[in-house]
């Protein structure tokens, strides 16, 4: 038997812990990997990426994210924003259980009109493991997943439903 979850949100975590405490230590699979899954839980991404970490690397804090030269990062306890002069060009969302450390989960990149055009997703090792591309209305169109070497391994097309 396996435990199969769409997302590893609070409800899924509670059920998972209840099953473990009840003696049901089944293989657990999460469909939507946010990059911060516990090591004993797999996802389609982690399976196909065959990810391993030889070095002890840590998740990235907001100040470790690369931004274009002369752009500025303004951070607070909830999120960080990226500015090109006085124009907001990005937003860093923190991983909520570790928000007080300002650990980055996603970086949203905006066009000059303020519409989201792409989003980089970072994992617990500080690597960009996925990129989501948005159309001019801000709707997700394509998501690419990368292995630890930055090679594209999975592409999900939201318009056609193909992977």
Please provide the spans of the model-predicted regions.
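Glycine/tyrosine- and acidic-biased, solvent-exposed loop/turn segments at the edges of beta-strands
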Residues: 1-163
């Amino acid at each position: 038997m396996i435990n199969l979850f769409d997302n590893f949100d609070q409800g899924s975590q509670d059920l998972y812990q209840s099953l473990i405490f009840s003696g049901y230590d089944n293989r657990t699979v999460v469909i939507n990997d946010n990059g911060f899954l516990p090591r004993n839980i797999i996802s389609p991404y982690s399976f196909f990426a065959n990810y391993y970490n030889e070095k002890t690397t840590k998740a990235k804090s907001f100040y470790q994210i690369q931004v274009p030269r002369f752009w500025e990062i303004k951070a607070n306890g909830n999120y960080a924003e990226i500015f090109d002069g006085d124009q907001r060009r990005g937003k860093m969302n923190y991983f909520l259980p570790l928000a007080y450390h300002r650990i980055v989960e996603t970086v949203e990149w905006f066009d000059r009109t303020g519409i989201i055009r792409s989003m980089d997703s970072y994992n617990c090792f500080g690597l960009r493991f996925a990129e989501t591309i948005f159309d001019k209305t801000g709707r997700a169109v394509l998501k690419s997943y990368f292995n630890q070497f930055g090679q594209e391994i999975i592409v999900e097309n939201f318009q056609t439903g193909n992977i």
